[in-house]
């Protein structure tokens, strides 16, 4: 199980070191994809395929299924964790989500999320504000 919040920095080559507690629970290859919010998600192969199957099984319309498949598969890359515990994040995923050098890595049970530090703080604060309203 993946859990916790970790603050890390991406290097100039768009590499991010995963916390040892998290990377020891993952094996190559892993799947990096756009999340539902302004984040990236990291999945193990088995969990990623289960999630895709679950999403597609909820759809009845073939057109919707094709569109969902396009969005998911075109925004997913298979990557490996290198021997130093780093992943290289493709530039297009960083640019599309405006993820900067400073990030949070969140463990969410069966996946990791990578957030821009500023965006995550804004997202979290807005959620807390809405809860208190």
Curated annotation (Swiss-Prot):
Q: Which domain of life is it from?
A: Bacteria
Give the signal peptide, or none: none
| Pfam families, per the entry | MraZ (PF02381)
State the compartments where it is located: Cytoplasm, Nucleoid
Q: Which residues form the SpoVT-AbrB domain?
A: 5-47, 76-119
Keywords assigned: Cytoplasm, DNA-binding, Repeat, Transcription, Transcription regulation
Record InterPro entries: MraZ (IPR003444), MraZ_C (IPR035644), MraZ_dom (IPR020603), MraZ_N (IPR035642), MraZ_sf (IPR038619), SpoVT-AbrB_dom (IPR007159), SpoVT-AbrB_sf (IPR037914)
One biological process term from GO is: negative regulation of DNA-templated transcription initiation
* Gene Ontology terms for molecular function: DNA-binding transcription factor activity; transcription cis-regulatory region binding
Keyword Plastid present in the record's keywords: the answer is no
Give an example GO cellular component term for this record: nucleoid
Chief subcellular location equals: cytoplasm
Asked if the record carries the keyword Plastid, the reply is no
User: How does the record describe its quaternary structure?
Assistant: Forms oligomers.
Q: Which HAMAP family match?
A: MraZ (MF_01008)
Family assignment? Answer: Belongs to the MraZ family.
Q: What is this protein called?
A: Transcriptional regulator MraZ
């Amino acid at each position: 199980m993946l859990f916790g919040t970790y603050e890390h920095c991406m290097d100039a080559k768009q590499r991010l070191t995963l916390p040892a507690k998290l990377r020891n629970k993952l094996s190559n290859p892993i799947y990096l994809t756009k999340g539902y919010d302004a984040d990236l998600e990291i999945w193990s192969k088995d969990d990623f395929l289960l999630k895709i199957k679950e999403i597609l099984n909820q759809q009845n319309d073939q057109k919707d299924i094709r569109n969902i498949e396009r969005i998911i598969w075109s925004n997913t890359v298979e990557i490996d964790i290198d021997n130093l515990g780093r992943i290289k994040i493709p530039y297009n995923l960083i640019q599309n989500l405006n993820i900067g050098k400073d990030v949070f890595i969140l463990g969410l049970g069966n996946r990791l999320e990578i957030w821009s530090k500023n965006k995550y703080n804004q997202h979290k604060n807005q959620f807390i504000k809405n809860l208190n309203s």
